[in-house]
Amino acid sequence: MDIPKDRFYTKTHEWALPEGDTVLVGITDYAQDALGDVVYVELPEVGRVVEKGEAVAVVESVKTASDIYAPVAGEIVEVNLALEKTPELVNQDPYGEGWIFRLKPRDMGDLDELLDAGGYQEVLESEA
């Protein structure tokens, strides 16, 4: 299971990659593998203000649908429109082209409350 060390993670299997004053968000390799083949992604609305832990998007697979939660509070500033036509990018490249949304955090310091790669690995091991 791939867990890049350049980003933060949540116990609900989202990743958060700081880029300047924004954070790119997607789901982990573990999450996409557990979901199976992704067939649809319900993207959040740009401009929406969200709280940490709020359900902001939905990823639907052939097996189930799963809410995607905001890792930190802030404003959605961009969504990955490529997922409307090619939702399988979430499976093919969960840490790259399969990102889901970008948000501008209310406080970048909130990222420090998230897990690093090692902490996320421990979460996966405890769930196994």
UniProtKB/Swiss-Prot annotation:
Pfam families: GCV_H. Its cofactor is (R)-lipoate. PROSITE patterns: BIOTINYL_LIPOYL, LIPOYL. Coiled coil: none annotated. Binds 1 lipoyl cofactor covalently. The glycine cleavage system is composed of four proteins: P, T, L and H. Monomer. This is Glycine cleavage system H protein. The gene is gcvH.
